[in-house]
Amino acid sequence: MLRVALVGATGAVGQQFILALNRHPWFELTHIVSSERSAGKKYIEALRDPHSGNLRWHSKEKIPDYIRDATLGKVEDINPKSFDLIFTALESEEARMIEPQFARWVPVISTAAAFRYEEDVPILIPGVNDDHVMLLNTQRKNRGWRGFIAPLPNCTTTGLVITLKPIMDKFGVEMVIMTSLQAVSGAGRSPGVVALDILDNVIPYIPKEEEKVQVETKKILGTLDSRAINPASLKVSCTCTRVPVLDGHTEAVYVSTERSCEPAEAKEEMLKFSKSAPIRNLPTAPKDFIFVHDDPTRPQPRVDREINDGMTTMVGRIRKDTAFNNGLKYILLSHNERMGSAKGAVLLAELLKDREVL
């Protein structure tokens, strides 16, 4: 068993990490850290609202017994040499200060954007760009670290890239236009989205989200040379919106392929990709990497987001689009807090262990 620590344990993403690591066959969570005000408290106590006394636990699943009475530590007291791996669920500013201190000694898997766009840092989605793992060795050499920082992509990027990969490999992709309908949980709980802003409403702007998706999509689908990733040449345009849905990001995707692609062929390639994904034997990997609905009313967040514990990217309404050369369009649904965040990070850790990088 590898000994792991979690920094940011009480937030929405941190809680998903707690669940994803419960009874994990490879990783043992031995240390948890949250904010300064929570240090020294038991985990269950730190989750209580100081004013109302309400328990701020945001999952339908109960708090695992193994963590309820665990004591939260301070970031500055962590000895990274005591762990084989550190997961972080931090805001970007905090991550930029804290993660390099850990990575000098031990691998760090991060959900933050702080280091995603640096030349020697791959943005990894298990099963999509596994060959980019080799860049972590370059990062170690460049920075003189024993460990590394391996960030996940933005949760909106995750489902988009997973569905584009099989299309790109078979038919090539010239251009992608995407509009997202993103769940409120993607904004976190603190500060999150104000109820009066989102109820009976759609917010047509999420700061920096569109730029992240555009850059990350090209980087993840790019090619690796000895020192860096050459971004894919496709054009990416997107509009990201916030909608009154709790969990699950829905995206309407329009693709112009280099070679003609019929809807049935796109479905076939997605299913082939799903069945042959090299992550299938990892503990957290879903039964289906991609699932394609024939029902034109699916996928739907409330109905589909929990399938395979939120680790499957759901696709539906694959159609021709005559507005583009070799045009194709479809709807996808990806669970932003599972595959797009904490459980996706645990899956990445499994991949790195399987590749003997950890």
What are these language model-derived features?
Residues 184-358:
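Charged docking surfaces used in two-component/phosphorelay signaling
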Residues 1-198, 202-205, 229, 234-235, ...:
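N-terminal Rossmann-like NAD(P) cofactor-binding subdomain of oxidoreductases
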